Amino acid sequence: MPPVKAEDLVVHAVKEQFAGLDYCITSPPPWITTVLVGFQHYLVMLGTTVLIATIIVPLMGGGHAEKAIVIQTILFLSGINTLLQVHFGTRLPAVMSGSYTYIYPAVAIILSPRYALLIDPLERFVFTMRSLQGALIIAGVFQAVVGFFGIWRVFIRFLSPLAAVPFVTLTGLGLFFFAFPGVTKCIEVGLPALVLLVIFAEYASHLFAKGSFVFSRCAVLVTVVIIWIYAEILTAAGAYNERGPVTQFSCRADRSGIIQGSPWVRFPYPFQWGYPIFCFQDCFAMLAASFASLIESTGTLIAVSRYSGATFCPPSVFSRGIGWEGISIILDGMCGTLTGTAASVENAGLLAVTRVGSRRVIKISALFMIFFSLFAKFGAVLASIPLPIFAALYCVLFAYSAGAGFSLLQYCNLNSLRTKFILSISLFLGLSIPQYFRVYEMFFGFGPVHTHSVAFNVMVNVIFSSPATVAAILAYLLDCTHLYWEASVKKDRGWFWWEKFKSYKYDGRSEEFYRLPYGLSRYFPSL
């Protein structure tokens, strides 16, 4: 055995900017790469859009036509909101799409007893939609106030790398129930998709020099095309003709209901279902989801900043981004998207898979969202891709997003018992508490908090059902209180590495990555 060289024992250097990218936030790739990677970002967020509509619309009494319009509306607003965030928000290459966090309060509003007397399904759909719109508008106002008034800036100023690790990690890991459990709904389609994606993205791209572009840049697209054709062959061969309705829904590639229900051309517009209905308890329920979504978006944006090659966001930039996210949710409520907008976790993972963190790519993906929403018939064809294929993609993409949280450990002293305590307790309870809330509701039909106030029940159950939110609260409080007075704590928690980014003017790279376009920074300066 050869002796170990001294240089091999040197500790890995700390990297404030992720070095494993081919194109960073300010370096756009060639146009062919830009278009192909941008289309993949659209394809990835499409799965979330279809899943949200599939869960909520039938509960409201809507059919295929209503579901198609909702999908079209979510896509259109996602494109608009992504452009707003990339141009005027954080300016990070983050896709803004529908958030899973809003599903819980949305379902609670839909199942409210006051709608039980509505017999006609379409009438029930319209009334519940209008109630959701009112609640979303209030939730958006809350986020806009928190962002634009600088309240979130105060939170970020005291955030250390140690406190950020748990909730950035659980922003990805906390969505595990949308990943492999979705694959198992049609294992003969989902599992091959998962295996192919891993082979193409992580093995073939390094082994085959001639096909490196296809595998490194288009692994998701190639995987989806191959498995979609495979699913079409299984469907045409009658493999699911004798299976149950649940299996057929998950596996069949000819879900023509969405295609038939979609118009050829349609432009979503504000209040297309009528004027919003503002109900006190509905608004409070949605406010809790807005708070949880705010934390999850922050975790996702930290992951995006890593995978785009940018430095850590200054607090004022984070606050600006959250403010624009609030504006996005208000637009969602006006047009009727069922759920609010948040930074897409899966698209953050796609930045790592493609190694392309360019801002221009995300702008192109937003244009794809808008195009396929306006020409809804074409978008409906892609929306008919079996959901287990998307679930297979999420197994890799959510994991990569979680990996961005692990990368922050480079700033921390892992030989400190304080560090181990904060990391372990926040990660463990961040997974354990939400799992308890989910299992409890699965068995009893309601959450552990079950008082006479429905709004209070939903608020508490929503917050403690979010792994990232639970982890963020625990890690932040523990990091800011436990042994805070000891001299070594600042170094152990990685505070000195991020101290230069706590003000916009302390590091020149902040101006390079986060300044507003069109000279707007002169009129809206960052602090």
Swiss-Prot record:
**Its topology with respect to the membrane?**
Multi-pass membrane protein
Control of this protein's activity is summarized as:
Inhibited by excess of xanthin, uric acid and ascorbic acid, and by 100 um N,N-dicyclohexylcarbodiimide and 30 um carbonyl cyanide m-chlorophenyl-hydrazone.
Q: In which tissues is it expressed?
A: Highly expressed in roots.
InterPro entries for this protein: NCS2 (IPR006043)
Annotated transmembrane regions: 43-63, 68-88, 92-112, 132-152, 163-183, 189-209, 219-239, 284-304, 361-383, 387-409, 427-447, 458-478
What S-S linkages are listed for this chain?
none
State the UniProt keywords alphabetically. Membrane, Transmembrane, Transmembrane helix
* Gene Ontology terms: cellular component: membrane
Q: Where in the cell is it found?
A: Membrane
| Gene null: resulting phenotype | Disrupted chloroplast ultrastructure.
A GO molecular function assigned to this protein is: transmembrane transporter activity
Q: Which family does it belong to?
A: Belongs to the nucleobase:cation symporter-2 (NCS2) (TC 2.A.40) family.
Protein role: High affinity uric acid-xanthine transporter in A.nidulans. Binds, but cannot transport ascorbic acid.
Identify this protein by name.
Nucleobase-ascorbate transporter LPE1
Q: What is this protein's gene name? A: LPE1
